[in-house]
Amino acid sequence: MLAAVEVFAGNGGSGYSRYGIGDISYFVSNRAIGMGGAGLSVLSNNSIARINPAGLSQINRTSYSISALYEGISTKDGIKSGYFGETFFDGFMIAIPISPKNGIVLSAGITPYSRINYNVITPDSFDNINYNTHFQGDGGLTQGNLAISALPINDIHVGAKFNYYMGTLNHTTQQSFGSSSEFSGVKRSLELRGVGFTIGSVYSGLKNALHLSDANSLNIGIVFSTTSYLTAIEEKFYTYKTATLTTRDTAASNNFKMRIPYSLGFGTSYLSERFLLATDIYYQNWKRYTFNGVSASELRDSYCFSIGGELLPKRDQSAPYLQRMPYRLGFFYNSSYYRINDKPINEFGITGGFGIPIFGDVRIDLGIEYSFRGTTDLQMQKDNIFRLSFSLSGSELWFVRPEQE
């Protein structure tokens, strides 16, 4: 549980990332960041879909993207407060069209799946002895992926993705006593490896049923990721220090299994010449999470609802620069997987962003997000979170034969 009184120490993020596997990263695409995260049903020829592999099927040039994320958290527990900011690598993706006519596109990448980042001190006493307990954690899970999409029949886009999970979760607990130099501590390190699979589909034929013009489209999408079983190698490092002696010990490694539950998402989107509107719902069955066969009472099923839009004033490359920039706005509500002290931890946020053309097909996508999470009830933490996403992407033709003279 989150302690009654916490002092926020040094670098670190929210204490909520102490639970489960940390804060879950949800990144649909560079474009979706400014749209509340909505985009599971969006088909694009210049934005690489990370979650729904069916969204790759319209890419017709070799495309790449690399992303970074700044996250600043202002957190308080009703007594103490603090602000922490840090910049993270947020993934690299590449997509290569094999047969654009048939929607066959291969993609590969490495992206964050979860992140642990906290550093708090809790003062306490026992039998008239004052002491501080220092909780610190870092690490997280990374996902390497290999995906393929196809267009087997008109308007039905399908995709499949192989996911390889890897990472290390570190949690350290240290107790120090009064003004003395004595302390004892234990560091628990989990090294995780495992695989999973994702399948998805987008249906783009609704415009025909509704007799929309060729310039418009109305899509629905679905994506499903399987339950994954990760092998966990656990090590514990013990430290005890007095004024005259420092003792360190390492416990033998143990092999366990961690169960990452399945997820299911649905989305709809409408695209016209100038506007894109999208809405999604994404669910993950975290009640089924287990470590070494034991479930976590601090976790619950999660739901994320997102809605957003994009305005592109002009598609003509000869139009004024500011009219060739897409402008984005969105909202999301994340009923997160945290349930601390029997209190659900929910997050509500507003997002915005825009794309900056650089030259050719190279562009920068900026996404800005401000959200609120948690509560100070029961002296838990309330977080105000600012996130700034930066993505550099582009495309070019590969494997094209020159025309014969």
Show where each model-derived region lies.
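Subset of outer-membrane beta-barrel
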Residues: 10-405
